[in-house]
Every structure is written in structure tokens, then in C-alpha cells.
């Protein structure tokens, strides 16, 4: 009987330790910096608009951040000769398109969000046309901080096949 009690106690201790380990860490990612919060906010918004559940693709995120760094001055304005949209042929009818988010009412001016504005936003609504919904095969959001504002770019892979 003593051996049985001891065995049950050891098993119970093992189960409790396992439960504690699975409850700690390894859970969902919680953004900590304002840049990460902006990326998570817009990733959720675009997944909702597209009706998808894409993860933030690391290669596309890197491309989005590179486009932001290459296109924006330190004050968040566009550099001479740069535009709000970057696209490249990735081969096999697949294109990579990066769009810098624009200010409402002016598609040629990058939208910079402050930390205070970001803290007050829990949801963003974006509109996506049907063609984008039908052709998007990958998604990522990249953000960079310039001055006191965060600028966001959306990177997508699109499969454009002619029938």
C-alpha cells in the first residue's frame, strides 16, 4: 500500500510539473514594441479583409521593411524618385507587391502613426478588392520607426495567371 501511495504521489507531481511547463511560454506571441504592435494590428486587419489566416511571412516582412527604409526619409516623407508601391516579378506568374500605407485622403503621402495613436487603436478596418482576395498567396506586414512615428507597409505575393 505504501508503494502505491508513493507511486501515485510521484505521478501526480509529474503531471503538475508538466501542466506548469505547458502553461508557461510557448503560447501566442504578444507584441512588445510599438513597431511589433503596429505589425500585429495591420496583420489582423488584412487577414480579416482577405478572409485568411496568414502568418507574417519572414521574407516578405523583411522586404516590406527594406522598402520602407529605402523609400522614406527620416521624417517619414518619400525620398525623391520613390513611390508608395513597389512590385517585382518573383517568377512563375508570382509577383511580390509592397504597398506603403497612405494617409487617408492622400494616397501619395505615407501614413505615420504615433505611439499614442497606436495605444488607442485596437482595430483597423481595411478594404481589399476582389482581385486582391483572389490572387493573394502570401502576406506580411513590416513597420519601421522614423522620428516619433511608425510607418507600415503591406507585402503580398500574388499569383497572376492568364487563362
Identify the residue ranges that each predicted region occupies.
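Residue-level signal for functionally critical sites in structured catalytic/ligand-binding pockets
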Residues: 1-2, 50, 61, 125, ...
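Bacterial Sec-dependent N-terminal signal peptides
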Residues: 1-11
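C-terminal motif of bacterial Sec signal peptides marking the signal peptidase cleavage site
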Residues: 19-23
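Short, conserved catalytic or interaction motifs in soluble domains
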Residues: 26
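Short, well-ordered surface patches within globular domains
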Residues: 29-94, 135-137
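A well-ordered secondary-structure block
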Residues: 88-163
Amino acid at each position: 500500500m505504501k508503494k502505491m501511495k508513493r507511486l501515485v504521489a510521484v505521478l501526480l507531481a509529474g503531471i503538475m510539473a508538466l501542466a506548469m511547463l505547458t502553461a508557461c511560454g510557448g503560447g501566442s506571441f504578444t507584441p512588445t514594441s510599438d513597431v511589433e504592435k503596429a505589425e500585429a494590428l495591420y496583420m489582423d486587419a488584412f487577414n480579416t479583409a482577405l478572409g485568411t489566416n496568414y502568418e507574417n511571412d519572414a521574407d516578405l516582412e523583411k522586404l516590406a521593411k527594406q522598402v520602407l527604409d529605402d523609400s522614406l526619409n527620416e521624417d517619414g516623407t518619400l525620398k525623391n524618385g520613390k513611390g508608395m508601391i513597389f512590385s517585382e516579378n518573383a517568377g512563375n506568374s508570382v509577383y511580390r507587391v509592397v504597398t506603403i500605407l497612405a494617409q487617408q485622403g492622400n494616397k501619395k503621402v505615407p501614413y505615420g502613426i504615433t505611439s499614442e495613436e497606436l495605444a488607442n487603436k485596437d482595430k483597423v478596418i481595411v478594404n481589399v478588392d476582389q482581385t486582391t482576395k483572389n490572387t493573394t498567396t502570401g502576406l506580411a506586414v513590416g513597420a519601421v520607426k522614423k522620428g516619433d512615428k511608425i510607418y507600415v507597409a503591406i507585402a503580398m505575393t500574388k499569383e497572376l495567371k492568364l487563362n
